[in-house]
Amino acid sequence: MSDQLELMTGTTVGIKAKDGVVLAAEKRVSYGFYLMSKSGKKVYPITNRIGLASSGILADIQTITKVIRANIANMEIEMKRPVSVRAAAKLLSIMLFQNKYMPYIAETMVGGIDEEGPKLFILDSWGSLIEDDFAALGNGARTAIGLIETGYSSSITVKEAKELAIKAIKEAIARDPTSGDGIDTLVITGNGYLEDSIKL
């Protein structure tokens, strides 16, 4: 168990705003204290209204993203309507739980906007599913969560949430050797999503 937790490298944050959701993560890919890449992508759009962000082993993050993206696309074709954020998160929860004996080494959050408004869900490697207003995952989470908690309010806008997410990740990067090398953000609103990348 402790070996697995040590592999939850990096820092990922999610913030639910009144008009959407912001997901963000730094770009460093490391195994222990070995720096493998400075350009890892850990934040992905799944549909035009749902996104995913994760900390952990990059191969597992990429696999989770591909599988959930394909399953949601199939569901939307079969149902002939968009999948809700909650349904997407539950689908991922089932997928993770089915692999509980050989779990993906990744902590994940799913966020987006649907008819019920903005939603943010947090999942561990075994598929536990928690809905929250904000979250931080990975080695830098302890540093990032304090900043987010201090700056968060229920009336926060996506613009303010993006600034808060970037500030929290920058602070985590300053204190966590497994985090660094830039920040990717994904802002999801009723108009779709917008990706951005910040070099540090």
UniProtKB/Swiss-Prot annotation:
It is found in: Cytoplasm. One of its GO terms (cellular component) is proteasome core complex, beta-subunit complex. GO terms for biological process: proteasomal protein catabolic process. The keyword Cytoplasm applies. InterPro entries: Ntn_hydrolases_N, Pept_T1A_Psome_bsu_arc, Pept_T1A_subB, Proteasome_bsu_CS, Proteasome_sua/b, Proteasome_suB-type. Residues 1-10 form a propeptide. Gene3D superfamilies: Glutamine Phosphoribosylpyrophosphate, subunit 1, domain 1 (3.60.20.10). One of its GO terms (molecular function) is threonine-type endopeptidase activity. Component of the proteasome core, a large protease complex with broad specificity involved in protein degradation. This is Proteasome subunit beta 2.
